[in-house]
A protein has these predicted regions:
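Non-catalytic signal-transmission and effector/linker regions of two-component phosphorelay proteins
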Residues: 1-22, 28-29, 35, 52, ...
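Conserved sequence signature across two-component system core domains
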Residues: 24-25, 48, 68, 100
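Generic detector of well-ordered alpha-helical packing
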Residues: 26-27, 72
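Short hydrophobic/Thr-rich beta-strand motif most characteristic of the beta2 strand and flanking loop
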Residues: 39-57
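Conserved beta-strand scaffold positions in the cores of enzyme catalytic domains, especially
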Residues: 45-47, 97, 119
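Conserved phosphotransfer microenvironments
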Residues: 65, 69-88
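Conserved phosphotransfer active-site motifs of two-component signaling proteins
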Residues: 74, 103-107
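Hydrophobic/aromatic residues positioned on beta-strands within the core alpha/beta folds
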Residues: 95, 100-101
């Protein structure tokens, strides 16, 4: 379990309020649970299982992403790192984000670091997830 938050500026609700978070996750149950949690903290959430889905959904709602979260092993057609990169390329500002994986390989860690994203390894507890996310907003 991670240490409790102690700094007053670390309130995730204050930091996520009004932020547009893109969530790339192919597992519908995980996607829904994560979306609900992010909405509880005040984020506007755009979800999908591919970059094409989330970019279309963001455009339909006229939203510009503040941050992207992607499962590394998204699908056979598009991995999470590629999908997050596509969202970044389509965003008119510098976009940061999190790549989440259970993969423990050094190669994946290096690939994520080269792409400029933060790697979180599963299982990720809520405090660690929120801390990493608020640092990327």
């Amino acid at each position: 379990m991670s240490a409790a938050r102690t700094l007053p500026g670390d309130d995730p609700k204050a930091m996520l309020a009004g932020q547009v978070v893109v969530l790339l996750e192919d597992d519908e149950l995980i996607r829904r649970a994560t979306e609900r949690m992010l909405r509880r903290f005040g984020a506007e959430v755009v979800t999908g299982a591919s970059s094409r889905e989330v970019l279309a959904a963001a455009a339909a709602r006229n939203l510009t992403p503040s941050c992207v979260i992607a499962d590394y092993w998204l699908s056979q057609e598009e991995d999470g790192l590629s999908a997050a990169g596509a969202v970044r390329e389509a965003t008119p500002r510098s976009l940061r984000g999190l790549i989440i994986t259970g993969d423990l390989s050094r190669e994946v860690a290096e690939e994520v670091a080269r792409a400029g994203f933060v790697l979180l390894r599963k299982p990720v507890n809520v405090d660690k997830f929120l801390d990493a996310l608020t640092r990327e907003i």
